[in-house]
Amino acid sequence: MAEITASLVKELRERTGAGMMDCKKALTEANGDIELAIENMRKSGAIKAAKKAGNVAADGVIKTKIDGNVAFILEVNCQTDFVAKDAGFQAFADKVLDAAVAGKITDVEVLKAQFEEERVALVAKIGENINIRRVASLEGDVLGSYQHGARIGVLVAAKGADEELVKQLAMHVAASKPEFVKPEDVSADVVEKEYQVQLDIAMQSGKPKEIAEKMVEGRMKKFTGEVSLTGQPFVMEPSKSVGQLLKEHNADVTGFIRFEVGEGIEKVETDFAAEVAAMSKQS
């Protein structure tokens, strides 16, 4: 067995753009023959996948599944809406979700490691970067899920509610984007940050500090209601809050999770004219 040196791994990385561990594995399998390693990597799609890895994957799908008293939600990203609808991509996402449910896996790194070879092969076949971005689970007495297309997914856990009510609550979460269950759940740092923003606004209006502070107290109550599920107007009956709805049904929401495709990912905006100009200079 030939010695796989650091310099050999470095050379293969520079020539293929693949990761260090992928290069080391390829060299080991090729007994240190770098040309054979490159050929094998081309056949497996590893080189093509490495080249695609730098592309921003901000499109994709959200998948949900309820298994007894535990529900799972998963986001898998690709680069375009076209690939997000591809049967092969959808099947890959379904397979990852099934594995998460079967193994009760909530560590996305575990899923990434488990499906890396299949991901690389799919990248080579489809021609876009693909990323298993995040996975989460929710336990509860009564569980409900809702998907708005494949781009928004919601899980809701409740007590004392029937399945229809939980489904409606999940639809509400999808539409209204609450961040917390109840106003009192809003974290202290979020409250303090908003308080300072509102105080600055009130002070800029020329009000004395004492009056400004009283104004802000009223605004903060409104703010914590707006960002919490129970404080929001129910989307299907805006005349009542979600909290009032739950009280009528003698029910309580114990938790929810909302995923939206690509949230928090910055998409690269391509300047087509600049791209063409750059290409013309190279030719």
From Swiss-Prot:
**Major place of residence:** cytoplasm
Which residue stretches belong to region Involved in Mg(2+) ion dislocation from EF-Tu?
80-83
Q: Where in the cell is it found?
A: Cytoplasm
Please give the InterPro entries that the UniProt record associates with this protein: EF-Ts_dimer_sf, Transl_elong_EFTs/EF1B, Transl_elong_EFTs/EF1B_dimer, Transl_elong_Ts_CS, UBA-like_sf
Report the GO terms under cellular component.
cytoplasm
Q: Which GO terms describe its molecular function?
A: translation elongation factor activity
Q: Does the keyword Cytoplasm apply?
A: yes
Q: Among its keywords, does the record have Protein biosynthesis?
A: yes
- Gene Ontology biological process: translational elongation
Cited Pfam families: EF_TS
Question: What are the entry keywords?
Answer: Cytoplasm, Elongation factor, Protein biosynthesis
Give the UniProt family note: Belongs to the EF-Ts family.
Functionally, this protein is described as follows: Associates with the EF-Tu.GDP complex and induces the exchange of GDP to GTP. It remains bound to the aminoacyl-tRNA.EF-Tu.GTP complex up to the GTP hydrolysis stage on the ribosome.
From the Swiss-Prot or TrEMBL record, give the protein name. Answer: Elongation factor Ts
